[in-house]
A protein has these predicted regions:
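Kelch-like beta-propeller repeat domains
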Residues: 1-358
Length: 358
Protein backbone atom coordinates (compact mmCIF):
# COMPACT_ATOMS: atom_id res chain seq x y z
CA UNK A 1 0.00 0.00 0.00
CA UNK A 2 2.71 2.44 -0.93
CA UNK A 3 4.80 1.77 2.15
CA UNK A 4 7.89 2.86 0.23
CA UNK A 5 6.62 6.41 -0.43
CA UNK A 6 9.09 9.17 0.39
CA UNK A 7 9.01 11.09 3.66
CA UNK A 8 6.16 13.52 3.99
CA UNK A 9 3.87 11.77 1.51
CA UNK A 10 0.41 11.13 2.93
CA UNK A 11 -0.85 7.59 2.43
CA UNK A 12 -4.41 6.36 1.92
CA UNK A 13 -5.76 4.10 4.65
CA UNK A 14 -8.24 1.31 4.73
CA UNK A 15 -10.49 2.63 7.47
CA UNK A 16 -12.64 0.40 9.64
CA UNK A 17 -11.08 -2.70 8.06
CA UNK A 18 -11.23 -6.05 9.79
CA UNK A 19 -13.58 -7.53 12.33
CA UNK A 20 -14.00 -6.65 15.97
CA UNK A 21 -12.27 -9.00 18.40
CA UNK A 22 -14.27 -9.48 21.55
CA UNK A 23 -13.72 -10.72 25.04
CA UNK A 24 -16.56 -11.30 27.46
CA UNK A 25 -17.14 -7.58 27.96
CA UNK A 26 -14.55 -5.74 25.88
CA UNK A 27 -13.43 -5.47 22.26
CA UNK A 28 -10.55 -4.29 20.07
CA UNK A 29 -12.17 -2.38 17.20
CA UNK A 30 -9.99 -1.91 14.08
CA UNK A 31 -10.04 1.69 12.86
CA UNK A 32 -7.20 1.73 10.31
CA UNK A 33 -5.13 -0.73 8.30
CA UNK A 34 -1.90 0.09 6.50
CA UNK A 35 1.35 -1.68 5.64
CA UNK A 36 3.23 1.06 7.51
CA UNK A 37 1.79 -0.24 10.79
CA UNK A 38 2.99 -3.81 10.18
CA UNK A 39 5.86 -4.08 12.65
CA UNK A 40 6.68 -5.45 16.10
CA UNK A 41 9.06 -4.55 18.92
CA UNK A 42 8.70 -0.92 17.85
CA UNK A 43 7.80 2.14 19.91
CA UNK A 44 4.63 4.21 19.75
CA UNK A 45 4.20 7.57 21.48
CA UNK A 46 1.80 10.48 21.33
CA UNK A 47 3.51 13.73 20.31
CA UNK A 48 1.50 16.85 19.45
CA UNK A 49 -1.68 14.84 18.94
CA UNK A 50 -0.20 12.21 16.63
CA UNK A 51 0.95 8.64 17.24
CA UNK A 52 4.62 8.31 16.25
CA UNK A 53 5.72 4.77 15.36
CA UNK A 54 9.46 4.20 15.23
CA UNK A 55 11.60 1.21 14.30
CA UNK A 56 10.77 -2.39 15.06
CA UNK A 57 10.88 -5.57 12.99
CA UNK A 58 8.95 -6.48 9.85
CA UNK A 59 9.31 -10.23 10.34
CA UNK A 60 10.47 -12.89 12.75
CA UNK A 61 13.55 -13.65 10.65
CA UNK A 62 16.55 -13.35 12.98
CA UNK A 63 18.86 -11.89 10.31
CA UNK A 64 16.50 -9.15 9.14
CA UNK A 65 17.71 -5.72 10.32
CA UNK A 66 15.40 -3.46 12.33
CA UNK A 67 13.52 -0.61 10.73
CA UNK A 68 14.66 2.98 11.08
CA UNK A 69 11.64 4.85 9.76
CA UNK A 70 9.28 7.19 11.61
CA UNK A 71 5.55 6.98 10.84
CA UNK A 72 2.96 9.50 12.06
CA UNK A 73 -0.68 8.47 12.46
CA UNK A 74 -3.33 11.14 12.99
CA UNK A 75 -6.06 9.53 15.12
CA UNK A 76 -8.52 12.32 14.33
CA UNK A 77 -8.19 12.32 10.54
CA UNK A 78 -7.15 8.63 10.33
CA UNK A 79 -4.27 9.55 8.02
CA UNK A 80 -0.69 8.27 8.06
CA UNK A 81 2.58 9.44 6.59
CA UNK A 82 6.25 8.60 6.75
CA UNK A 83 7.87 11.62 8.38
CA UNK A 84 11.33 10.13 8.78
CA UNK A 85 12.72 7.82 6.07
CA UNK A 86 14.47 4.52 6.75
CA UNK A 87 17.90 6.10 6.67
CA UNK A 88 18.77 6.94 10.27
CA UNK A 89 19.47 4.76 13.26
CA UNK A 90 17.75 1.37 13.11
CA UNK A 91 16.26 0.07 16.33
CA UNK A 92 14.06 -2.67 17.72
CA UNK A 93 13.40 -3.72 21.33
CA UNK A 94 14.13 -0.11 22.35
CA UNK A 95 12.10 2.23 24.53
CA UNK A 96 11.20 5.88 24.25
CA UNK A 97 10.16 8.98 26.18
CA UNK A 98 8.65 12.25 24.97
CA UNK A 99 10.33 15.44 26.17
CA UNK A 100 8.54 18.82 26.16
CA UNK A 101 5.98 17.45 23.69
CA UNK A 102 8.66 17.94 21.03
CA UNK A 103 11.53 15.46 21.23
CA UNK A 104 11.06 11.72 20.90
CA UNK A 105 13.95 10.33 22.93
CA UNK A 106 14.98 6.82 21.79
CA UNK A 107 16.91 4.90 24.43
CA UNK A 108 18.95 1.78 23.69
CA UNK A 109 17.73 -1.17 21.65
CA UNK A 110 18.99 -3.63 19.04
CA UNK A 111 20.56 -2.05 15.93
CA UNK A 112 20.85 -5.27 13.93
CA UNK A 113 24.33 -6.12 15.19
CA UNK A 114 24.59 -4.96 18.80
CA UNK A 115 22.58 -3.98 21.83
CA UNK A 116 23.27 -0.31 22.40
CA UNK A 117 22.75 2.15 25.25
CA UNK A 118 23.09 5.31 23.14
CA UNK A 119 20.39 7.98 23.06
CA UNK A 120 19.12 9.66 19.91
CA UNK A 121 16.22 12.08 19.51
CA UNK A 122 13.73 12.95 16.80
CA UNK A 123 12.91 16.66 16.81
CA UNK A 124 9.29 16.89 15.68
CA UNK A 125 9.51 20.64 15.03
CA UNK A 126 12.61 20.38 12.84
CA UNK A 127 11.61 17.01 11.35
CA UNK A 128 15.08 15.55 11.81
CA UNK A 129 17.20 13.29 13.98
CA UNK A 130 19.62 14.66 16.56
CA UNK A 131 22.65 12.73 17.72
CA UNK A 132 23.07 13.42 21.43
CA UNK A 133 26.47 13.22 23.12
CA UNK A 134 27.45 11.46 26.33
CA UNK A 135 27.93 13.72 29.33
CA UNK A 136 31.27 13.73 31.20
CA UNK A 137 29.96 11.60 34.08
CA UNK A 138 28.20 9.02 31.90
CA UNK A 139 28.25 5.49 33.34
CA UNK A 140 26.19 3.55 30.79
CA UNK A 141 25.02 -0.06 30.81
CA UNK A 142 26.85 -2.37 28.41
CA UNK A 143 23.82 -2.58 26.14
CA UNK A 144 20.06 -2.34 26.40
CA UNK A 145 17.20 -4.20 24.75
CA UNK A 146 13.76 -5.25 25.97
CA UNK A 147 14.20 -2.78 28.84
CA UNK A 148 11.81 -0.10 30.06
CA UNK A 149 12.42 3.64 30.10
CA UNK A 150 10.00 5.68 32.21
CA UNK A 151 9.80 9.47 32.24
CA UNK A 152 10.11 11.00 35.71
CA UNK A 153 10.57 14.62 34.61
CA UNK A 154 11.65 16.56 31.52
CA UNK A 155 15.27 15.87 32.51
CA UNK A 156 15.13 12.47 34.21
CA UNK A 157 14.24 8.96 33.01
CA UNK A 158 14.35 5.64 34.88
CA UNK A 159 15.72 2.60 32.98
CA UNK A 160 15.08 -0.94 34.24
CA UNK A 161 16.16 -4.35 32.95
CA UNK A 162 17.69 -5.64 29.75
CA UNK A 163 17.84 -8.74 27.58
CA UNK A 164 19.04 -12.08 28.95
CA UNK A 165 18.07 -15.64 28.07
CA UNK A 166 16.32 -17.79 30.66
CA UNK A 167 19.27 -20.18 30.91
CA UNK A 168 21.78 -17.38 31.38
CA UNK A 169 19.49 -14.97 33.17
CA UNK A 170 21.33 -12.84 35.67
CA UNK A 171 20.13 -12.89 39.23
CA UNK A 172 19.68 -9.14 39.45
CA UNK A 173 18.92 -6.32 37.03
CA UNK A 174 20.50 -2.93 37.45
CA UNK A 175 18.40 0.22 37.69
CA UNK A 176 19.69 3.36 35.99
CA UNK A 177 18.75 7.00 36.21
CA UNK A 178 19.18 8.60 32.79
CA UNK A 179 19.63 12.37 32.81
CA UNK A 180 18.79 14.17 29.57
CA UNK A 181 19.27 17.79 28.51
CA UNK A 182 17.63 18.86 25.23
CA UNK A 183 19.31 22.29 25.43
CA UNK A 184 22.83 20.85 25.32
CA UNK A 185 21.82 17.61 23.56
CA UNK A 186 23.60 15.50 26.17
CA UNK A 187 22.74 12.50 28.32
CA UNK A 188 24.35 10.52 31.10
CA UNK A 189 23.51 7.34 32.97
CA UNK A 190 23.95 6.73 36.68
CA UNK A 191 23.51 3.27 38.19
CA UNK A 192 21.30 3.21 41.28
CA UNK A 193 22.17 1.22 44.40
CA UNK A 194 18.86 -0.66 44.36
CA UNK A 195 18.19 -3.54 41.96
CA UNK A 196 15.33 -5.73 40.81
CA UNK A 197 15.15 -9.35 39.79
CA UNK A 198 16.51 -9.82 36.27
CA UNK A 199 13.85 -8.90 33.70
CA UNK A 200 13.50 -8.40 29.93
CA UNK A 201 10.34 -7.72 27.98
CA UNK A 202 8.64 -6.55 31.18
CA UNK A 203 6.36 -3.58 31.83
CA UNK A 204 6.85 -0.57 34.10
CA UNK A 205 3.95 1.39 35.62
CA UNK A 206 4.38 4.81 37.25
CA UNK A 207 1.57 4.79 39.81
CA UNK A 208 0.36 7.19 42.47
CA UNK A 209 0.41 6.10 46.10
CA UNK A 210 -0.17 7.79 49.45
CA UNK A 211 3.36 9.21 49.60
CA UNK A 212 3.71 10.25 45.97
CA UNK A 213 4.62 7.87 43.16
CA UNK A 214 6.18 4.47 42.75
CA UNK A 215 7.47 2.65 39.66
CA UNK A 216 6.13 -0.91 39.65
CA UNK A 217 7.53 -3.53 37.24
CA UNK A 218 6.04 -6.91 36.35
CA UNK A 219 6.55 -9.64 33.76
CA UNK A 220 9.68 -10.34 31.77
CA UNK A 221 10.62 -13.42 33.79
CA UNK A 222 9.18 -16.80 34.79
CA UNK A 223 7.33 -15.55 37.86
CA UNK A 224 4.38 -13.40 38.87
CA UNK A 225 6.33 -11.09 41.17
CA UNK A 226 5.82 -7.33 41.06
CA UNK A 227 8.67 -5.12 42.26
CA UNK A 228 9.13 -1.45 43.02
CA UNK A 229 11.94 0.07 40.94
CA UNK A 230 11.70 3.59 42.33
CA UNK A 231 9.82 5.86 44.74
CA UNK A 232 9.37 9.62 44.55
CA UNK A 233 7.64 12.21 46.71
CA UNK A 234 4.71 14.21 45.38
CA UNK A 235 6.88 17.14 44.33
CA UNK A 236 9.53 15.07 42.57
CA UNK A 237 7.47 13.79 39.64
CA UNK A 238 6.86 16.22 36.80
CA UNK A 239 4.81 14.20 34.34
CA UNK A 240 1.41 15.25 33.05
CA UNK A 241 -1.30 12.71 33.79
CA UNK A 242 -3.56 12.10 30.80
CA UNK A 243 -7.19 12.96 31.47
CA UNK A 244 -9.35 9.96 30.51
CA UNK A 245 -12.62 10.12 32.47
CA UNK A 246 -14.65 7.98 30.06
CA UNK A 247 -12.13 5.15 29.90
CA UNK A 248 -11.57 5.31 33.67
CA UNK A 249 -15.31 4.92 34.23
CA UNK A 250 -15.48 2.03 31.74
CA UNK A 251 -12.59 0.20 33.42
CA UNK A 252 -14.21 0.74 36.82
CA UNK A 253 -17.38 -0.87 35.49
CA UNK A 254 -15.42 -3.72 33.90
CA UNK A 255 -13.53 -4.74 37.04
CA UNK A 256 -16.70 -4.38 39.10
CA UNK A 257 -18.09 -7.46 37.38
CA UNK A 258 -15.19 -9.77 38.35
CA UNK A 259 -13.18 -10.97 41.33
CA UNK A 260 -9.60 -9.77 41.43
CA UNK A 261 -6.35 -11.41 42.47
CA UNK A 262 -3.24 -10.07 44.17
CA UNK A 263 -1.07 -12.09 41.77
CA UNK A 264 0.25 -10.49 38.59
CA UNK A 265 0.27 -12.43 35.29
CA UNK A 266 2.80 -15.26 35.60
CA UNK A 267 5.61 -15.75 33.11
CA UNK A 268 4.48 -13.06 30.67
CA UNK A 269 6.78 -10.94 28.51
CA UNK A 270 6.59 -8.50 25.59
CA UNK A 271 3.06 -7.48 26.55
CA UNK A 272 1.78 -3.91 26.33
CA UNK A 273 0.89 -1.84 29.38
CA UNK A 274 -0.63 1.64 29.70
CA UNK A 275 -1.65 3.55 32.83
CA UNK A 276 -5.21 4.92 32.70
CA UNK A 277 -6.07 6.94 35.82
CA UNK A 278 -5.96 4.56 38.83
CA UNK A 279 -5.72 1.56 36.50
CA UNK A 280 -3.05 -0.06 34.37
CA UNK A 281 -4.19 -1.99 31.29
CA UNK A 282 -1.97 -4.83 30.03
CA UNK A 283 -2.66 -6.87 26.91
CA UNK A 284 -1.23 -9.83 25.01
CA UNK A 285 2.40 -10.86 25.21
CA UNK A 286 4.16 -14.18 25.20
CA UNK A 287 3.83 -16.74 27.97
CA UNK A 288 6.89 -18.54 29.31
CA UNK A 289 4.76 -21.28 30.88
CA UNK A 290 4.06 -23.15 27.61
CA UNK A 291 6.28 -24.59 24.89
CA UNK A 292 3.79 -24.08 22.03
CA UNK A 293 1.10 -21.54 21.14
CA UNK A 294 2.79 -19.01 23.39
CA UNK A 295 1.29 -15.75 22.06
CA UNK A 296 -1.55 -14.43 24.26
CA UNK A 297 -4.68 -12.30 23.86
CA UNK A 298 -5.78 -11.78 27.47
CA UNK A 299 -6.61 -8.34 28.82
CA UNK A 300 -5.42 -7.56 32.37
CA UNK A 301 -6.50 -4.60 34.48
CA UNK A 302 -4.50 -3.57 37.57
CA UNK A 303 -6.69 -1.66 40.04
CA UNK A 304 -4.79 0.55 42.50
CA UNK A 305 -7.89 2.02 44.18
CA UNK A 306 -7.87 -0.72 46.80
CA UNK A 307 -5.07 -1.72 49.17
CA UNK A 308 -3.44 -3.98 48.26
CA UNK A 309 -4.08 -3.46 44.52
CA UNK A 310 -5.76 -6.24 42.54
CA UNK A 311 -5.31 -7.81 39.10
CA UNK A 312 -8.29 -8.70 36.91
CA UNK A 313 -8.03 -11.05 33.92
CA UNK A 314 -10.39 -10.87 30.94
CA UNK A 315 -9.76 -13.63 28.37
CA UNK A 316 -10.52 -13.39 24.64
CA UNK A 317 -11.71 -16.29 22.48
CA UNK A 318 -10.55 -14.75 19.17
CA UNK A 319 -7.16 -16.26 18.25
CA UNK A 320 -6.73 -13.63 15.58
CA UNK A 321 -6.18 -10.98 18.25
CA UNK A 322 -3.16 -12.66 19.81
CA UNK A 323 -0.34 -10.11 19.92
CA UNK A 324 3.28 -9.93 21.01
CA UNK A 325 5.75 -7.06 20.63
CA UNK A 326 2.88 -4.60 20.12
CA UNK A 327 2.21 -1.23 21.77
CA UNK A 328 -0.73 0.55 23.35
CA UNK A 329 -1.14 4.34 23.63
CA UNK A 330 -3.66 6.50 25.46
CA UNK A 331 -4.89 9.59 23.66
CA UNK A 332 -8.09 11.64 23.82
CA UNK A 333 -9.78 9.16 26.18
CA UNK A 334 -9.10 6.20 23.87
CA UNK A 335 -6.64 3.32 24.16
CA UNK A 336 -4.97 2.44 20.85
CA UNK A 337 -3.42 -0.95 19.95
CA UNK A 338 -0.65 -0.65 17.37
CA UNK A 339 1.12 -3.41 15.43
CA UNK A 340 2.80 -6.46 16.93
CA UNK A 341 3.26 -10.02 15.70
CA UNK A 342 0.12 -12.13 15.47
CA UNK A 343 -0.67 -15.70 16.67
CA UNK A 344 2.36 -17.28 14.95
CA UNK A 345 4.75 -14.85 16.63
CA UNK A 346 6.35 -13.78 13.34
CA UNK A 347 3.72 -12.15 11.08
CA UNK A 348 3.22 -8.43 11.78
CA UNK A 349 -0.28 -7.01 12.12
CA UNK A 350 -0.96 -3.92 9.94
CA UNK A 351 -3.86 -2.65 12.06
CA UNK A 352 -4.52 0.06 14.60
CA UNK A 353 -7.42 -0.70 16.94
CA UNK A 354 -9.17 1.03 19.83
CA UNK A 355 -10.37 -0.63 23.01
CA UNK A 356 -14.14 -0.63 23.41
CA UNK A 357 -15.83 -1.46 26.70
CA UNK A 358 -19.64 -1.37 26.33
Amino acid sequence: MGANRLAGGALPLQVGAGTMATGSSWAWKPIARNALFARAYHSCDVVQGKLLLFGGLKSGEPKEPPLGDMVAFDPTLLTAETVGPNGGDRRSHHDTAVLANRWLCVVGGWDGAHRVSAVCCWDTEQGQWERWAEGPSNDPPVGLSSHTCTKVSEHELRVVGREGGLRTQRRFASIYTLRVNPATKTYWYKEEESRTASRAGHSAMLLRDAGGYQLVVFGGRDSSDCEVAGRWGKGKIHVESIHAPKMTEQLSRLVGSENGSRQAPKGLRHQSCTVVGPFAVAFGGETLTKGRDTVCNDLYVYDTRCSPPSWFRFPCSDRGQKRVGHRTCLWNDKLYLVGGFGPDGKTPCPEICVLEIP
